[in-house]
């Protein structure tokens, strides 16, 4: 079976999340230092009696407001888009690492290259035909495939075995006769033992 994710993916996502947070705090500290400098310059001004001192006072207050406004706007944008997406991707990989995995056997239909966003993570979809015990009919299942990973190179009608977690593809491969024999032996052993 071909694994979609590796341990290095988890480590890369963790490093990316931490680096983005470090970059944010570095940028925020620059804005904070600039704000403190202009505030100290404002406090060191003498009482505003002349036009020149009043204009400096207004300049320092305006610069402080502008710097603070830019810092707030950039914080919302930065923490709302790149950091949030990196955090969601890391959370997905962390859930995959410890979560329950489900093994299925289905008939492959096609890959859908359109982008689907689920939980702030982008996916493509792999469409398979799967038997439903509840409705007693075949149903189309849209299995999520990470956008950053290559799509499975399968043909329409291939019988595949795949493992998912929360409908996200973790590994896949062609169904083989040896797997059937192995699973039958396990089932017979469970019934006898």
Which role fits each region the language model picked out?
Residues 1-9:
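Short, charged cytosolic
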Residues 10, 50-53, 102, 118, ...:
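Extended hydrophobic/Leu-rich segments
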Residues 11-94:
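Alpha-helical transmembrane spans
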Residues 97-119:
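Structural detector for short beta-strands of small beta-barrel domains
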Residues 108, 126-129, 157-162:
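Hydrophobic beta-strand residues in large extracellular and virion-surface proteins
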Residues 114-131:
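Short aromatic-glycine-enriched beta-strand elements
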Residues 129-141:
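Short, basic/aromatic beta-hairpin or loop at an interaction surface
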Residues 138-193:
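A membrane-cytosol interface segment of integral membrane proteins
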